[in-house]
């Protein structure tokens, strides 16, 4: 493990992703599985690869990810956030374009808590006039 590697932590909803960028040929491994087997949907794979495609570093780094918590969309967003942070650590000149695309900003939207007297966060029990 004497190779140069760049670390980045990404978060989205309840998901946390620990990302390592290692010089390589663009292979993405998530929880020791290929990206194609981990994410069935093409849209999620596109979300994960967005920062690499935007900066033109897709073929320069192998991406090793450890992600837990949340669902598929949250995990994809967390991985994108982690990759972006690691890319900025590798090359500070990439910061402006990644910031402009909004990848450096942690998405603050979280699940709203359930309130008592209601069925869900905002869903009220059915109203009966009589």
Curated annotation (Swiss-Prot):
What are the start and end residues of every segment in region (Disordered)?
99-130
Cite the record's Basic residues compositional bias ranges. Answer: 111-130
**One Pfam family recorded for the sequence:** Ribosomal_S9
Q: Can you supply a Gene Ontology BP term from the record?
A: translation
Q: What is this protein called?
A: Small ribosomal subunit protein uS9
Q: Does the keyword Ribosomal protein belong to this entry?
A: yes
Q: Which UniProt keywords apply?
A: Ribonucleoprotein, Ribosomal protein
A GO molecular function term, named singly, is: structural constituent of ribosome
- Organism superkingdom: Bacteria
Instruction: Write down the InterPro entries for this protein, in alphabetical order.
Output: Ribosomal_Su5_D2-typ_SF (IPR020568), Ribosomal_uS9 (IPR000754), Ribosomal_uS9_bac/plastid (IPR023035), Ribosomal_uS9_CS (IPR020574), Ribsml_uS5_D2-typ_fold_subgr (IPR014721)
What ranges does the record list as Basic and acidic residues composition bias? 99-110
């Amino acid at each position: 493990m004497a190779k140069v590697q760049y670390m980045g932590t990404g978060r989205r909803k309840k998901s946390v992703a620990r990302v390592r960028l290692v010089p390589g040929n663009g292979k993405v491994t998530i929880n020791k599985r290929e990206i194609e087997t981990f994410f069935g949907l093409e849209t999620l794979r596109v979300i994960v690869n967005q920062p690499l495609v935007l900066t033109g570093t897709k073929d320069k780094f192998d991406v090793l990810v450890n992600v837990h918590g949340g669902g598929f969309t949250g995990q994809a967003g967390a991985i994108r956030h982690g990759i972006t942070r690691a890319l900025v650590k590798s090359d500070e000149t990439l910061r402006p374009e990644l910031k402009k695309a909004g990848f450096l900003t942690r998405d603050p939207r979280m699940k709203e808590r359930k309130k008592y007297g209601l069925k869900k966060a905002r869903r009220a029990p059915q109203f009966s006039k009589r």
